[in-house]
UniProtKB/Swiss-Prot annotation:
One of its GO terms (cellular component) is membrane. It is found in: Membrane; Cytoplasmic vesicle, Secretory vesicle, Acrosome. This is Transmembrane protein 210. Its main location: membrane. Residues 128-147 are annotated as: Disordered. PANTHER family: TRANSMEMBRANE PROTEIN 210. The lineage of its organism: Eukaryota, Metazoa, Chordata, Craniata, Vertebrata. It is a single-pass type I membrane protein.
Length: 147
């Protein structure tokens, strides 16, 4: 047995109500008389339906995109096959390689390495200008203006 018709108050806000309203507006779009008295003109109701249809379509597209993303994420639990040509041409893919850190320790010291690698400024014909030490204290900051 089919359920009875819904009360009119249930049809106002939901998608079924919007579908019902659009069915009422089909004769209005054809140029015939419309019995819907919502306080809006026929053109305003048609514009409202167009806007609501656009919003519904964009929400549906967003839902489809999210669903595809979730399905792809669930499908990538096993490692993928990687084309070796892509790895060679575009660099190393670290998530698929087993990298281990390498520590090198040496007890030998080279005499040349103990010398600083940066030459002194005097060798570059640059002169460092020393700051003059001033015994004067800086002047106090000006007082704040009254509020």
């Amino acid at each position: 047995m089919a359920p009875g018709p819904w009360p009119v108050s249930c049809l106002r806000g939901g998608p079924l109500g919007l579908t019902y309203l659009s069915l009422l507006l089909i004769p209005a779009a054809a140029g015939t008389y419309c019995e819907c008295s919502l306080g809006l003109s026929r053109e305003a109701l048609i514009a409202l339906l167009v806007v609501l249809a656009g919003i519904s379509a964009s929400c549906f597209c967003a839902l489809v995109i999210v669903a595809i993303g979730v399905l792809r994420a669930k499908g990538e639990t096993c490692p993928r096959q990687v084309d070796n040509r892509l790895v060679e041409n575009f660099g190393v893919q670290e998530d698929l390689m087993d990298l281990h850190p390498v520590y090198v320790e040496s007890q030998l010291m080279d005499a040349d390495l103990e010398v600083s690698l940066v030459p002194p400024l005097e060798d570059q014909s640059l002169v460092a200008i020393p700051m003059e030490a001033s015994s004067e204290e800086p002047p106090p900051p000006p007082p704040l203006p009254p509020e």
